[in-house]
Amino acid sequence: MAISKDDILEAVGNLTVLELNDLVKAFEEKFGVSAAAMAAPAAGGAAGGAAAEEQTEFTVILADFGANKVGVIKAVREITGLGLKEAKDLVDAAPKPLKEGVSKADAEAAKKKLEEAGAKAEIK
């Protein structure tokens, strides 16, 4: 019997966050792809109507790691759950999106934690 799409969705839905992280890494290794979110193309004329609505999803951007690189790496690990190497690579690549599609409260908390560690962060 073949596994259906619904069976896969049900199985993935029952995984913990750590198990999902391991699954994503396994997909990246097996298929040679990256799970990094791609930038969406800019919308043309429809952007005017959407601007009137209140923004509900925010992106936290690590603009600069400042003088305390080690502290910023620790903060990035806490915020994202990344491993040490991945967090260091992300900090080294600043400016870089750290979290995407999060609520305003989560974005503010992440920005505060980064700034307390000595980094410069932005919310878009």
Curated annotation (Swiss-Prot):
InterPro entries: Ribosomal_bL12, Ribosomal_bL12_C, Ribosomal_bL12_C/ClpS-like, Ribosomal_bL12_oligo, Ribosomal_bL12_oligo_N_sf. Signal peptide: none annotated. CDD domains: Ribosomal_L7_L12 (cd00387). The keyword Ribosomal protein applies. GO terms for molecular function: mRNA binding; structural constituent of ribosome. One of its GO terms (biological process) is translation. The keyword Ribonucleoprotein applies. It holds the Pfam family Ribosomal_L12. Keywords: Ribonucleoprotein, Ribosomal protein. Gene3D superfamilies: 3.30.1390.10, Single helix bin. It comes from the Bacteria. GO terms for cellular component: cytosolic large ribosomal subunit. Homodimer. Part of the ribosomal stalk of the 50S ribosomal subunit. Forms a multimeric L10(L12)X complex, where L10 forms an elongated spine to which 2 to 4 L12 dimers bind in a sequential fashion. Binds GTP-bound translation factors. Belongs to the bacterial ribosomal protein bL12 family. Forms part of the ribosomal stalk which helps the ribosome interact with GTP-bound translation factors. Is thus essential for accurate translation. HAMAP family: Ribosomal_bL12 (MF_00368). This is Large ribosomal subunit protein bL12.
